[in-house]
Amino acid sequence: MKKYIIIGIIALVLILGGGAFALFSSLTGGPWEGTWWGVQEAGMNWSGDHIKTLETFTFTKNDDKTISVEHRVQQGSKEVEGRLSGSGTIDGGRLIVTTKRGKEVTFSYARIDKTIETPLKNVDKTAVTIKPLTEENNADMEEIRSEIVKISQKPENAIDTTLSSARS
């Protein structure tokens, strides 16, 4: 008899715990809100610099249950709009986004490490993952941004735009 009571109590605790987790997840808005950031490892350039691209994504819930995605990319000293900006819908732990160019891409949320896997790839073909921007990691993000700008401003990385003219 005691064995059945203990099993019943364990089952009840598991059911209540799962319900509480589901309620908490739905009330906190899930991962598809706020600003998230990550770094794309792009390899080495011709002058031996380790090239990185800072990727930031801002997810905004709309009244029609869609999610607006604003993708920004730090390219050298400029921050430009990324190619993954668009509008998406939630499908379980995934966000399916139709970009402004009409391409459909998928973002996947990993609950265990609380990161989002993007469709972007690093030089080693692994997916670029992003994490939420917080006060604690904002300094890390800005340090990476400053490294990217510094590398782009090195004289050996300047693009020569002068045209040479050959005389015959």
Regions found by a protein language model. Name each.
Residues 1-15:
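N-terminal Sec-pathway targeting helices
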Residues 8, 17, 38, 82, ...:
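Small side chains
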Residues 16-30:
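Sec-dependent signal peptide cleavage junction
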Residues 28-55:
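Tryptophan-anchored aromatic micro-motifs
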Residues 37-41, 68-74, 95-100, 118-120:
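Short beta-strand segments that buttress and anchor functional surface loops
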Residues 50-52, 77, 100-104, 121-125:
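Glycine-centered tight beta-turn/hairpin loop motif at sheet-sheet or coil-to-beta transitions
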Residues 81-94, 106-168:
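Edge beta-strand at a domain terminus
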